[in-house]
Amino acid sequence: MAQEYLDFELPIAELEAKIESLRSVASQDDEINLDDEIARLQKKSAELTKKTFANLDAWQVSKMARHPNRPYTLDYIERIFTEFEELAGDRAFADDKAIVGGLARLDGKPVMVIGHQKGRSVKDKVKRNFGMPAPEGYRKALRLMQMAERFNLPIITFIDTPGAYPGVGAEERGQSEAIARNLREMSTLKVPVICTVIGEGGSGGALAIGVGDKVNMLQYSTYSVISPEGCASILWKSAEKASTAAEVMGLTANRLKELNLIDSIIEEPLGGAHRDFDAMAHNLKQRLLDDLKELEMLDEDNLLHRRYNRLMDYGYC
């Protein structure tokens, strides 16, 4: 996968291009030793990356959440879980590829894992509908959650969508009903539910698999009722005000943690999750294991009571 860079990463990209050029020259001639120069540039690149990412604004974080190289649900499933067995279809209409899910093991423990899935190639993006589920996607997710409840399996969800698909067909098949039903049913599931925003957390399309006992966010993910561009178009009649909208929307992990709307912020590798899939997966896995250990100590009544109180606290100052 070719590395892509965002606008504020371009100075870093220039340094890394120089490093690759020197490596190429050195590999073609054994008599040329460029190790010292390469090491100097690598140190400079690391320092610049650290400085760049030390104080990203909300708009830059929004861009990071959408980074085309960012790991998706299946990337994490491959690195965190074993024996993953994908389950398909909502048993009513179709199998929506924008949501994937199935049985797996987390450190040997059986779990149900569900998440939004975007595509990499043009063909895969179309197949996955750019990570925007239709009603059948949410109904598939609910089917798997109810299956997990029957077999007393913890549920782990990964959220990464710009929003539910707003097409005519999706509306005709009951998009709003599918989302609303998921919200209701997830609030009363009798097994632990751990939700993590790994990229974009867009509106009801994200919330439909986001009601849980623990809600976490990756460091450079976002969670909001609308995109910054959409908000800017409504309030300022111009999508060019997206950066301003991002600042006032409070969509970053840090801001949502301040508001007690999420439980934990999972640190990303220097430069973002896309720089090191394995390191990011390691951090995420540890968070999931810690959360699961805590939740498994609760009996069913306490689990549901705590989840109910959590939901009732939303919106209070």
Swiss-Prot record:
Database matches in SUPFAM superfamilies: ClpP/crotonase
Presence of the UniProt keyword Lipid metabolism in the record: yes
EC number: 2.1.3.15
InterPro entries: Acetyl_CoA_COase_a_su (IPR001095), ClpP/crotonase-like_dom_sf (IPR029045), COA_CT_C (IPR011763)
GO biological process terms held by the UniProt record: fatty acid biosynthetic process; malonyl-CoA biosynthetic process
Domain spans labelled CoA carboxyltransferase C-terminal: 33-294
Key words, A-Z: ATP-binding, Cytoplasm, Fatty acid biosynthesis, Fatty acid metabolism, Lipid biosynthesis, Lipid metabolism, Nucleotide-binding, Transferase
GO CC, alphabetical: acetyl-CoA carboxylase complex
Compartments in which it is found: Cytoplasm
Entry annotated with the keyword Nucleotide-binding: yes
Gene3D superfamilies: 2-enoyl-CoA Hydratase, Chain A, domain 1
Pfam families: ACCA
GO molecular function, one term: acetyl-CoA carboxylase activity
Pathway membership: Lipid metabolism; malonyl-CoA biosynthesis; malonyl-CoA from acetyl-CoA: step 1/1
Catalytic activity: N(6)-carboxybiotinyl-L-lysyl-[protein] + acetyl-CoA = N(6)-biotinyl-L-lysyl-[protein] + malonyl-CoA
Known role: Component of the acetyl coenzyme A carboxylase (ACC) complex. First, biotin carboxylase catalyzes the carboxylation of biotin on its carrier protein (BCCP) and then the CO(2) group is transferred by the carboxyltransferase to acetyl-CoA to form malonyl-CoA.
Assembly with partners or alone: Acetyl-CoA carboxylase is a heterohexamer composed of biotin carboxyl carrier protein (AccB), biotin carboxylase (AccC) and two subunits each of ACCase subunit alpha (AccA) and ACCase subunit beta (AccD).
Record-stated family: Belongs to the AccA family.
Name this polypeptide is given: Acetyl-coenzyme A carboxylase carboxyl transferase subunit alpha
Record organism: Pasteurella multocida (strain Pm70)
Higher taxonomy: Bacteria, Pseudomonadati, Pseudomonadota, Gammaproteobacteria, Pasteurellales
